[in-house]
Amino acid sequence: MKYAILALALLFSTSLSAQNKKTSTTMYRHVVMFKFKASSSKESVDNIVKAFIALKSEIPVIKAFEWGLNVSPEHQDQGITHCFVVTFASTQDRDGVYQDHPAHVKFKNLVGPHVEKVVVVDFKVEN
């Protein structure tokens, strides 16, 4: 019985140690929000969304990608309808690889003519 308790304590301690290592990984979020021009068609906006999603498979330094439509009831969105969150392991990945990557440059050229307003916020994840 004494050995079983010792084994459980050791297993629990190892599990907590592994959990702490996971949460200590530094991550950076790149949040991009768009207000599209009224003249942009639904088809154009849908193509832009698909192109942004495709960056995840084209740029290996993107660790995670999420997006969604504004559903806030607060009416403080200033016309912003789309929000995208891109996760990087480092600022070097974001600034040195992603920003100048040909797929990202192509995406910016695609979206540019359709956007009335862009808001970008980057932050280091604090747990």
Regions found by a protein language model. Give the residues of each.
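Short S/T/G/P-rich N-terminal loop/turn motif that feeds into the first structured element of a domain
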Residues: Y3, S17-T81, A89-G96, F123-N127
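Sec-dependent N-terminal signal peptides
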Residues: A4-F12
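Short, structurally constrained coil/turn elements
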Residues: F12, E58-V61, H114
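Alpha-helical and His/Cys-centered functional microenvironments
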Residues: F12, F34, K108
